[in-house]
């Protein structure tokens, strides 16, 4: 169908943009494993990825990538990843340098950073994510493995009934929403409209 053909053409374009060269689906069997360590090192170099990712065995993780899983995407899914989730190199005119399987492994590595057997756990996470058996929330997909490890979707806070508490809650909301966290505030402790406030 035309939709699948559009997705394949977009995939070709993404590969060319990220790797700087064209590659067929068959060639990606080796190219993904070769490109993956370069992707991680470049992300660390430009300050987007957490330096701790360099401690992983890149050869092992690169070998675990399954290029055929790129073909699971329809056009809209692939375009959404490109537009909203892939890492962007602002130093090179906004070039996306992340590919679908690199994206899933980057997220998996971020989730496995504190695991004892981190390569094994990263591969397990990668396999459930890249097969769509499980999908993490948007903040996790945005931030896992990056310098900002804010992975939660929602934060619930209680605002205290004083000037410091109200403005502290506003500040916390701004910082949390900066990295895609959803917010819920309990304003119950704050006195009602028209209530007496001691002043000068």
Features from the language model and the residues they span:
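Extended catalytic cores of very large enzyme megasubunits
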Residues: 1-200
């Amino acid at each position: 169908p035309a939709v699948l053909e559009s997705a394949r053409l977009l995939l070709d374009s993404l590969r060319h943009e990220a790797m700087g060269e064209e590659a067929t689906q068959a060639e990606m069997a080796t190219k993904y494993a070769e490109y993956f360590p370069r992707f991680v090192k470049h992300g660390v170099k430009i300050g987007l990825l957490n330096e701790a990712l360099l401690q992983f065995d890149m050869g092992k993780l690169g070998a675990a990538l399954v290029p055929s899983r790129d073909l699971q995407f329809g056009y809209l899914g692939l375009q959404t990843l490109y537009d909203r989730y892939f890492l962007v190199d602002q130093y090179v005119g906004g070039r996306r340098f992340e590919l679908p399987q690199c994206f899933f492994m980057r997220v998996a590595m971020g989730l496995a950073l504190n695991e004892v057997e981190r390569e094994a756990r990263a591969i397990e996470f990668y396999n459930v994510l890249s097969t769509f058996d499980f999908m993490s929330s948007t903040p996790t997909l945005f931030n896992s493995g990056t310098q900002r490890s804010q992975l939660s979707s929602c934060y619930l806070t209680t605002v205290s009934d004083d000037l410091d508490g109200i403005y502290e809650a506003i500040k916390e909301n701004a910082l949390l929403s900066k990295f895609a966290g959803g917010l819920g505030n309990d304003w119950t402790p704050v006195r009602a409209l028209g209530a007496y406030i001691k002043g000068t």
